[in-house]
Amino acid sequence: MNTEILGVILQIVLMVALAYPLGKYIAKVYKGQKTWSDFMKPIERLIFKVCGINPTEEMNWKQFLKALLILNAFWFVWGMVLLVTQHWLPLNPDGNGPQTPDQAFNTCISFMVNCNLQHYSGESGLTYFTQLFVIMLFQFITAATGMAAMAGIMKSISAKTTKTIGNFWNFLVLSSTRILLPLSLIVGFILILQGTPMGFDGKMEVTTLEGQEQLVSQGPAAAIVPIKQLGTNGGGYFGVNSSHPLENPTYLSNMVECWSILIIPMAMVFALGFYSNRKKLAYCIFGVMLFAYLAGVGINVYQEMNGNPRIDELGIAQDGGAMEGKEVRLGAAATALWSITTTVTSNGSVNGMHDSTMPLSGMMEMLNMQINTWFGGVGVGWMNYYTFIIIAVFISGLMVGRTPEFLGKKVEAREMKIATVVALLHPFVILVGTALSTYLFAHHPDFVASEGGWLNNPGFHGLSEQLYEFTSCAANNGSGFEGLGDNTYFWNYACGWVLILSRFIPIVGQVAIAGLLAQKKFIPESAGTLKTDTVTFAVMTFAVIFIVAALSFFPVHALSTIAEHFSL
């Protein structure tokens, strides 16, 4: 047990320690300063030349968003075409068939919005070609899209008064070539050393310990797993994600993959401080996020290592903790750490089944996604926190009788309205979606039965499974309580639309706020200025997040996870 706890502590320390220098490097990349990765410039110039892009051309916030949305729309069409025709394409040694239109729609939307809501199993639902040229490609593009959006916001808040927020295409390419690609190569090399397969052969026939013949899927897993983690996408190469012994073979590979989930989201907070020369602000934001993260880790590690009281009643020893749905080679503590790490970000990968975690652990996993501001996805995580900063600034200003300001710019009704819509959209789509699915389940059983039935676990846990699915979609996370039968018309289309709304409306709103504030006249700090880089304001922001985001979900948790906890 002590060894497992030490492993958890070591991983967290490594994340924090390495995020700081990486954040400094990221800020230099976006500022165009000299870095060790300047050898990539010829490749970047070639990309810009082939695509007809002038990387030095500045964009206003509307042009920036237009480029972002056009890029995503193009790749959505690309993905749809490839997924429904994948059985005709090369690199399909196992003869896997095409995806149905509704499943392809869900898959494309999911990966286009940097989610990994997989209503299919990777071994049989995709080919090597679509794994590489749809899934892996999307994992680079969508991660770089979020990072580019944050780079634009960092540029806007760093300038005193400006009508432009940088060039989307330039930030997109730099995010890919200077940050995501180098880190992916390092992680991929480590995974290959640990035993993750990298090749294009078909299924391998092996003889099990029982003497039975079994076919084991392989393929280019080591190329895809690094970016799935670093880009906070989380889409597993294999159906059971990083629980699979070939996707995550050893405790070392588990540490590296878990580290990869959080390193860039953490670094982006520090990058904000270095880019804007406001390190104290970055430290305050990082402190709030880290506090929430550590609280979640503590609760889940405690819950999972103490085991299941129902099993205790049977007189069965649980020295390893609550091991249902967990890998013996990893243990309960490492699985609990991963469950929080993957849900405070938009990653969604798993190294154990969240459906099998203790009820309060499941509640913490959902609350992380329902709050959706602790580190979050690469780029967009801080942007969600930025929304609540605007709300907190406005409320704080009203409370003390000062004009609401953030970084020398007045926060007025227009920005506040946008921030409010973005903040309320998240609980709205989750709760309305869950209400619709539970209504259909209770009052239209024939429809549910026609889709094969949805729930394997009725009662409190059945509600949790439906709530988790919509929560995961809205947070662009993609993990799931897999007792839910979700590869149906209802879940594919309902989740697809939630994914679209929850990805693009917040990005549009957050970039719009940054663009509107950037155009305003800069007001120098004075004795009457509300300081946003203090512990007091950090606590205020945390309180606003807790009240607006967390409390919206406590009634439904009282009927699901909390009720299930007290029923044990």
Region roles according to the model:
Residues M1-N106, T161-G166, N170-T207, Y283, ...:
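N-terminal alpha-helical transmembrane segments of multi-pass membrane transport
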Residues K66-F76, F138-A148, E257-V269, G381-I395, ...:
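Hydrophobic alpha-helical transmembrane segments
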Residues L68-L82, L174-P197, I261-I264, G273, ...:
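Selective recognition of specific alpha-helical transmembrane segments in multi-pass small-molecule
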Residues P90-V134, P197-W259, D312-V380, V448-L501, ...:
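P-loop potassium selectivity filter motif centered on the GYG triad
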Residues L126-F200, L252-Y283:
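A conserved hydrophobic secondary-structure block that centers on an alpha-helix together
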Residues F270-S276, L398-E412, A512-D533:
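Alpha-helical transmembrane segments
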